[in-house]
C-alpha cells in the first residue's frame, strides 16, 4: 500500500519536478562547458593575436574572458537551483560541488555571482571606452587597468561579505521541507540521494539584503547607461562629416551591429533578476522559475566570447587561421573583406582616431 502511494506521488506530483531538475543538470553542462571552451579560446587569441593599437582595449576584453571562464567553471561545479521558501533563500546544488561540502557549494555560488557582476560593470566600461575614443580622448592601458581594479573592488567586497553569510544547512533543510512538503525532499527513497543545500535564513538580514540588492538593482542603471553610450556612439559613427571608403563604411555598419548585439547581452541578467525578485515576493512560483534563474545567467559568459570573436577582426581572423592551418586550404593574410582599407583617409572633426577605432574593431 505504501509503495502504491509513493509511486502515485512520484508520478503525479514529482515526476515533472524531477524531470526539470535533471534538465537543469543537462543545461548546465551544455551551457557552461562550451562557455569555458569559448573563453579559453578567446584568452589564447588575446594573448597571441592582439595588435598594438588594440592593447589598451584588450584589457577590458581580457577581463571579460577571465571572469567569464571562471564563471563557467564555477557554475558547472555548483549547478544551483534556488528554492524560495518564505523569505529564506535555499539553494539546492546539483553539480560536483555537492561531493565536497555545502559550504564549498555556497562559495561557488557566491564566486559565480561576483564574477557575473564584475562582467556587467566591465561591459559598461567597454561602451564608455568606445565613446571616449570617438570623442577624441585616448585612454591608456594604465587608465583601463585602474578602471578595472576600481570596478572589481566593488564585486570583491561583495564576495568577501556574502561568502561568510551562509546559514546552517540542517536548519535550511528543515525550512525547505516545511515550506515545500510537496517536494518530499526528506524522502531519500524518492530522490535516491541526500539533497545538498545551503543559502540564507532570511533575505532581509542586513548582509543578505545588501548582497541581493547588489545583484539585482544595478543591472537596470547599468543597462540604461549602456544604451545611452551606445546611442551616442552611433550618433558619432553616423556623422555625415566622417568621410570613409566603401570598405570602411561596410565595417562601420558592422560596428553598429556589434554594438547592438553586445547591448543585448545584459538582457539575460535583467530577466533573471526580474524572475528572482518576483519569485522572492511570491508573485510567481513553481519549478520553472526555480530552475531557470541561474541558467539564464549562465548564458551571459557563453555568448560574450562568441560575440567578441565574431565582431573583433584580429580575433576572428586569428581563429580562422588556426582552424585552417592544418587543413591544407589556402590561408590568406587578409580574410575576405573584414579588414578595413589601410589607406583610407578620414577627415572630420573627430580626427583619425575614428578610423583607427573602426579598423581595430572589425
Curated annotation (Swiss-Prot):
Superkingdom, taxonomy of origin: Eukaryota
Major site of localization recorded for this protein: membrane
Alphabetical UniProt keywords: Membrane, Receptor, Transmembrane, Transmembrane helix
GO cellular component: membrane
Transmembrane regions listed in the UniProt entry: 27-47, 57-77, 104-124, 144-164, 209-229, 264-284, 292-312
A family per Pfam: 7TM_GPCR_Srd
InterPro entries assigned: 7TM_GPCR_serpentine_rcpt_Srd (IPR019421), Nematode_rcpt-like_delta (IPR050920)
Family statement: Belongs to the nematode receptor-like protein srd family.
Functional note: Thought to be a chemosensory receptor.
The protein's name: Serpentine receptor class delta-2
Amino acid at each position: 500500500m505504501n509503495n502504491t502511494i509513493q509511486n502515485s506521488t512520484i508520478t503525479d506530483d514529482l515526476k515533472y519536478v524531477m524531470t526539470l531538475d535533471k534538465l537543469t543538470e543537462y543545461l548546465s553542462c551544455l551551457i557552461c562547458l562550451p562557455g569555458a571552451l569559448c573563453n579559453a579560446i578567446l584568452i589564447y587569441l588575446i594573448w597571441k593575436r592582439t595588435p598594438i593599437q588594440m592593447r589598451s582595449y584588450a584589457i577590458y576584453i581580457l577581463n571579460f574572458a577571465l571572469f567569464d571562464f571562471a564563471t563557467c567553471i564555477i557554475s558547472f561545479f555548483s549547478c544551483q537551483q534556488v528554492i524560495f521558501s518564505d523569505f529564506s533563500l535555499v539553494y539546492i546544488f546539483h553539480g560536483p560541488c555537492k561531493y565536497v561540502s555545502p559550504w564549498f557549494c555556497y562559495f561557488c555560488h557566491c564566486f559565480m555571482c561576483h564574477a557575473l557582476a564584475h562582467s556587467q560593470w566591465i561591459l559598461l566600461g567597454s561602451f564608455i571606452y568606445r565613446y571616449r575614443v570617438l570623442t577624441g580622448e585616448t585612454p591608456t592601458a594604465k587608465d583601463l587597468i585602474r578602471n578595472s581594479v576600481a570596478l572589481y573592488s566593488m564585486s570583491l567586497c561583495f564576495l568577501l561579505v556574502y561568502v561568510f553569510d551562509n546559514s546552517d544547512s540542517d536548519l535550511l533543510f528543515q525550512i525547505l521541507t516545511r515550506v515545500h512538503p510537496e517536494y518530499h525532499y526528506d524522502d531519500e527513497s524518492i530522490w535516491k540521494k541526500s539533497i545538498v543545500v545551503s543559502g540564507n535564513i532570511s533575505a532581509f538580514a542586513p548582509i543578505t539584503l545588501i548582497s541581493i540588492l547588489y545583484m539585482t538593482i544595478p543591472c537596470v542603471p547599468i543597462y540604461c547607461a549602456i544604451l545611452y553610450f551606445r546611442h551616442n556612439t552611433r550618433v558619432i559613427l553616423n556623422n555625415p562629416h566622417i568621410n570613409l571608403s566603401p570598405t570602411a563604411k561596410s565595417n562601420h555598419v558592422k560596428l553598429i551591429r556589434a554594438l547592438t548585439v553586445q547591448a543585448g547581452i545584459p538582457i539575460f541578467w535583467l530577466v533573471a533578476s526580474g524572475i528572482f525578485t518576483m519569485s522572492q515576493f511570491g508573485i510567481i512560483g513553481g519549478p520553472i522559475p526555480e530552475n531557470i534563474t541561474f541558467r539564464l545567467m549562465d548564458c551571459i559568459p557563453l555568448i560574450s566570447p562568441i560575440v567578441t570573436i565574431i565582431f573583433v577582426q584580429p580575433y576572428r581572423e586569428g581563429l580562422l587561421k588556426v582552424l585552417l592551418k592544418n587543413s591544407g586550404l589556402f590561408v590568406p593574410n587578409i580574410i575576405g573583406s573584414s579588414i578595413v582599407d589601410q589607406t583610407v583617409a578620414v577627415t572630420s572633426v573627430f580626427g583619425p582616431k575614428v578610423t583607427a577605432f573602426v579598423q581595430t574593431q572589425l
